[in-house]
């Protein structure tokens, strides 16, 4: 749920809403991670996610990205 995502990772760095879909974006040094949330009844639920390098044409260190996401989880635990 959107509440669970916010409790786990904190508020996003960027948020976009279109009709019944919302994207929460977290911008980390190693990657940018987007979570896709769709309206299901009265709540938004996470239905998918994607990550990419912070800059176009740059390679991404997936292990470092995972570590930074883990750090966000730890900080909000």
Report residues per predicted region.
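Residues within mature, well-folded domains
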Residues: 1-77
């Amino acid at each position: 749920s959107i509440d669970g995502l916010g409790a786990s990772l904190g508020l996003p760095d960027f948020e976009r809403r279109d009709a019944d879909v919302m994207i929460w974006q977290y911008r980390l040094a190693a990657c940018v991670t987007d979570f896709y949330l769709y309206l299901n009844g009265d709540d938004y639920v996470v239905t998918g996610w994607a990550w990419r390098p912070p800059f176009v044409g740059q390679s991404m260190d997936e292990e470092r990205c995972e570590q930074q996401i883990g750090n966000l989880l730890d900080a909000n635990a």
